[in-house]
């Protein structure tokens, strides 16, 4: 092989190795769990390895209307079934508005999209939401628990929010206690319903049939089972009908004798 040809071959090999190196780097990042789907601000889907992001929004308005804003981001690892939450603190305007809503017995609402990682629009599939009295959130110092209910297809079918402690007792709360959320999150996977006990039912029927075959006493006819009740009834009817038959015969004989005497 000539020198120029050997040099061209080595150059081609170097180019192939260089092209394969970024691919391995990307693969190692995925294996290490660095890639996440839907972790952006909008909770949209990107490349990932089994982790999806959900945008958590909340709403608390003076007129009790629903105007949702971002509260934080939920990260759901679908491989190990874990759920985590990152959220921002309330600013001064939001703290004041939350106090006003609580004073008016208004509601504090939360919502998450039904389809994790789905873009906004018709494909988003809508939202699931929940609410608590705003006064209970204020008096709990923003301590709440979020539970995410999911189905086997990986869709969100429900969300619930509760405050600790719950209830509204009219306690005074300092402004510093309404800055940071103290939230615990929980993932509620689908519960498999128990299947019909067909096999157990068939086995029980077979055992009953085998027991009847071993005990022929249960195979007797109706008369064989209840003859001790039937025979006395028949004898009683026969004996009670005998005098009536004799009386009818005597009356017939008397009539015949009177006729012969004429």
Swiss-Prot record:
Alphabetical UniProt keywords: Angiogenesis, Endoplasmic reticulum, Membrane, Signal, Transmembrane, Transmembrane helix
GO biological process: one example: positive regulation of endothelial cell migration
Main localization of the protein described in the UniProt heading: endoplasmic reticulum
Lumenal side: 26-221
Localization annotation: Endoplasmic reticulum membrane
Presence of keyword Ligase: no
GO cellular component: EMC complex; endoplasmic reticulum membrane; membrane
Pfam families per record: ECM10
CDD domains, per database record: EMC10
Topology Cytoplasmic: residue spans: 243-262
Family (UniProt): Belongs to the EMC10 family.
Subunit structure: Component of the ER membrane protein complex (EMC).
Protein known as: ER membrane protein complex subunit 10
């Amino acid at each position: 092989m000539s020198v120029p040809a050997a040099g061209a071959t080595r150059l081609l090999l170097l180019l192939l190795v260089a092209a394969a190196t970024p691919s391995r780097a990307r693969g190692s990042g995925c294996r290490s769990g660095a890639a996440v789907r839907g972790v952006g601000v909008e909770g949209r889907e990107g490349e990932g390895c089994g982790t999806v992001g959900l945008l958590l929004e909340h709403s608390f308005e003076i007129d009790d209307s629903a105007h949702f804003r971002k509260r934080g981001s939920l990260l759901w690892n679908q491989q190990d079934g874990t759920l985590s939450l990152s959220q921002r603190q309330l600013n001064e305007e939001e703290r004041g508005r939350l106090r006003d809503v609580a004073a008016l017995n208004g509601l504090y609402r939360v919502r998450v999209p039904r389809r994790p990682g789905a873009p906004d629009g018709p494909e988003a599939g809508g939202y699931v939401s929940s609410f608590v009295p705003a006064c209970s959130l204020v008096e709990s110092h923003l301590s709440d628990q979020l539970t995410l209910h999911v189905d086997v297809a990986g869709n969100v079918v429900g969300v619930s929010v509760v405050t600790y402690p719950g209830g509204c007792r009219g306690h005074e709360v300092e402004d510093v206690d309404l800055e940071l959320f103290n939230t615990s999150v929980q993932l509620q996977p689908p519960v498999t319903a128990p299947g019909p006990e067909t096999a157990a039912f068939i086995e029980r029927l077979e055992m009953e049939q085998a027991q009847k075959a071993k005990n022929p006493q249960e195979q007797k006819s109706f008369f064989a089972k209840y003859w001790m009740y039937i025979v006395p009834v028949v004898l009683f009817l026969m004996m009670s009908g005998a005098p009536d038959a004799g009386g009818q015969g005597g009356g017939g004989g008397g009539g015949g004798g009177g006729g012969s005497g004429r």
